[in-house]
Amino acid sequence: MNYANFGLDFLNSVANAVVEGKKLDLASKGLQLKSRALDTERAFNYDRLAFEKHKFETNNDLKIYGDAMRISALRAAGLRINPYSNGRQIYQDEADLANLHSYYSFYKTD
């Protein structure tokens, strides 16, 4: 039996065990990074899906209720909404009120 070869074989097996341990550590870190990347990608896809769903629902609501929402906002702002008017017509009482206001603002009669 050659004891020199036995010593080299023993050192070689120890070195191989250390190398295999390092390989396992690197492989586990690689799997952790891949898992983290997949989790991030999945979260991004879920967030994008939620955004697309919100965008679809908003567009759907605007298609269905958009005109009514616009009219109610204009009325809330104080505008007179006449669906049969072209927007250039005013009523006589509005013209009288505008004339009266311009008269009092021009001829300050305090």
From Swiss-Prot:
Coiled coil: none
A Pfam family reported for this protein in Swiss-Prot or TrEMBL: Vesi_VP2
One Gene Ontology CC term in the entry: viral capsid, decoration
Disulfide bonds: none
Keywords assigned by UniProt, alphabetized: Capsid decoration protein, Capsid protein, Host cytoplasm, Virion
Keyword Chloroplast: no
Secretion signal, residue range per the UniProt entry: none
Major place of residence: virion
Location of this chain's protein in the cell: Virion; Host cytoplasm
Further details from the record: Translated by a ribosomal termination-reinitiation process from the bicistronic mRNA coding for VP1 and VP2.
Purpose: Minor structural protein that forms a portal-like structure at a unique three-fold axis of symmetry, following binding to the host receptor. The channel formed by VP2 may allow the delivery of the viral genome through the host endosomal membrane.
Family indicated by similarity: Belongs to the vesivirus VP2 protein family.
Protein name (Swiss-Prot/TrEMBL): Minor capsid protein VP2
Higher taxonomy: Viruses, Riboviria, Orthornavirae, Pisuviricota, Pisoniviricetes
